[in-house]
From Swiss-Prot:
It catalyses: (2S,3S)-versiconal hemiacetal acetate + H2O = (2S-3S)-versiconal hemiacetal + acetate + H(+); (3S)-versiconol acetate + H2O = (S)-versiconol + acetate + H(+). This is Versiconal hemiacetal acetate esterase stcI. Pathway: Mycotoxin biosynthesis; sterigmatocystin biosynthesis. Induction: The genes forming the sterigmatocystin biosynthesis cluster are co-regulated and induced on oatmeal porridge or the fungal isolates were grown either on oatmeal porridge or in YEC medium (0.2% yeast extract, 5.0% corn steep liquor). Expression is positively regulated by the cluster-specific transcription factor aflR that binds the palindromic sequence 5'-TCG(N5)CGA-3'found in the promoter. Belongs to the 'GDXG' lipolytic enzyme family. Esterase; part of the gene cluster that mediates the biosynthesis of sterigmatocystin (ST), a polyketide-derived furanocoumarin which is part of the most toxic and carcinogenic compounds among the known mycotoxins. The first step in the biosynthesis of sterigmatocystin is the production of hexanoate by the fatty acid synthase (FAS) units stcJ and stcK. The polyketide backbone is assembled by the non-reducing polyketide synthase stcA by condensation of the starter hexanoyl-CoA and 7 malonyl-CoA extender units followed by cyclization and release of norsolorinic acid. The gene is stcI. Its EC number is 3.1.1.94.
Length: 286
């Protein structure tokens, strides 16, 4: 796992995409003991609120590594965003990261008592977005949960996928896309092992959460060459069955995190992705 951290750290230090938009005000604070960076869009009075949870398989990633991306979201969506520096596994195992996310969420809810929050995250951060929102719903705060925006999120542990889903061929992306994306099947297994959550715990496998039908709105996006493709499809289908308003964009041929690869060949794809993402955030927040 240390090798993964070293490789990704080198990549993130070499490439800074998108470039940080310095017109967005950023302030570092400690909320309830948790490092948090607060991004405020320029020239917007009383902007909507969102929490952002970075990617990294619960074992790596940081506020700094996704600073440029969150600044872009803040400005385009005209939303005040709180980026959460939650503790990482394996040093801090489940549910410590989730506890940090909930601490920041509750702090923001107390600071802005008349506003609801949109929960945004990518990959493992998408899992944190669902889990934080659903925990607040379970705690009777569903009216303060505006919705979830999850990009290629983990929604279920492979060991907790139902036999019916497997028999119908609805969970095959771990095998089909194993060598097509950075988050290979073996890498995902390592991430789950380090995180240490029981496979059937609904705070990890949010697809199984009893409060799923109480979410307000959900937007998701994923590439169909991603191992997490079927996590998104299963969550989409579950939300539809529960009559939760959901929108989902799928990108044929694209792997995990293609929206942030610094390649000129991906400019058209990334323009489409960011346009759809902006529409999704605005739809959830309206």
């Amino acid at each position: 796992m240390q090798g993964w951290k070293t490789i990704v750290g080198k990549l993130m230090s070499r490439y800074d995409f998108p470039l940080p938009d310095l017109s967005v005000q950023a302030e570092d604070k400690i909320l309830g003991g948790v490092p948090t960076r607060i991004y405020t869009p320029p020239d917007v009075a009383d902007p909507p609120l969102a929490l952002y949870f970075h990617a990294g398989g619960w074992v790596m990633g940081s506020i700094d590594e996704e600073d440029g991306f969150v600044r872009t979201l803040c400005k385009l969506a005209r939303t005040r965003i709180f980026s959460v520096g939650y503790r990482l596994a394996p040093e801090f195992r489940f549910p410590m990261a989730l506890d940090d996310c909930l601490t920041v969420a509750r702090s923001v809810l107390e600071t802005y008592p008349v506003q609801s929050i949109c929960f945004i995250g990518a990959s493992a951060g998408g899992n944190m977005a669902f889990s934080t929102a659903l925990t607040l719903v379970s705690d009777g705060l569903g009216d303060r949960v505006q919705g979830v925006v999850a990009l290629a999120p983990v929604t279920v542990h492979p060991d907790s996928v139902s036999a019916d889903n497997r028999d119908r061929g609805e969970y095959t992306s771990y095998e089909e896309n194993d060598r097509l994306t950075i988050n290979t099947g073996s890498a995902m297994r390592s991430f789950f092992d380090c995180y240490g959550a029981p496979p059937d715990d609904p705070r990890l496998s949010c697809l199984l959460h009893p409060g799923l039908g109480k979410l307000n709105k959900v937007y998701m996006a994923v590439g169909d060459a991603d191992t997490l493709r079927d996590d998104v499809r299963l969550m989409r289908d579950a939300l539809v069955a529960l009559e939760v308003p959901v929108k989902c964009d799928e990108y044929p041929g694209y792997p995990h995190f293609s929206w942030l690869f610094p390649s000129p060949a991906l400019r058209e794809h990334q323009a489409l992705f960011f346009g759809n993402l902006l529409s999704g955030i605005c739809w959830v927040c309206e």
